[in-house]
């Protein structure tokens, strides 16, 4: 029996969440996480890593399936979005982060987690603020 494309896409999406969540739960905060530059994230696929850079864009996709917020983390010296890591905060975890599309935009930070591959790009799911560490602390005004 063949599944129609929307059903197959939903099944693949669900499987990705389960696999990535399992990987995150096992390894995301391991002492063995390597530290890499966003431009090297593609080579880090399948590994747990800490990726440090600047959030070049932060977009909340309200109304889309899972209501994700996409953070594009780039190397500040080479801000090429094609060589960036996409960090994803899904809607069910969003409240833990406040309004990440405003508080994280332009921030110099590190994200730690399992790097997966999605639509030709490296991606990391963020489920808790413990996966974030600021290189330069945000001001009180930015946190409001």
Task: State where each predicted segment sits.
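Bacterial N-terminal signal peptides that target proteins for export
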Residues: 5-19
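OB-fold and OB-like single-stranded nucleic-acid-recognition modules
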Residues: 32-144
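N-terminal signal peptide c-region/cleavage motif recognized by signal peptidases
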Residues: 28-30
């Amino acid at each position: 029996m063949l599944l129609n494309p929307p059903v197959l896409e939903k099944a693949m999406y669900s499987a990705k969440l389960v696999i990535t969540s399992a990987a995150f739960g096992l390894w995301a905060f391991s002492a063995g996480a390597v530290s890499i530059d966003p431009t090297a994230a593609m080579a880090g696929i399948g590994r747990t890593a800490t990726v440090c850079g600047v959030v070049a864009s932060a977009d909340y996709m309200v109304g889309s399936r899972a209501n994700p917020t996409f953070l594009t983390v780039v190397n500040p010296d080479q801000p090429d979005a094609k060589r960036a890591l996409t960090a994803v905060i899904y809607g069910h975890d969003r409240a833990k982060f406040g309004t990440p599309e405003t508080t994280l935009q332009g921030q110099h930070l590190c994200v730690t987690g399992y790097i997966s591959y999605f639509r030709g790009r490296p991606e990391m799911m963020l489920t808790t603020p413990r996966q974030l560490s600021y290189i330069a602390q945000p001001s009180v005004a930015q946190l409001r």
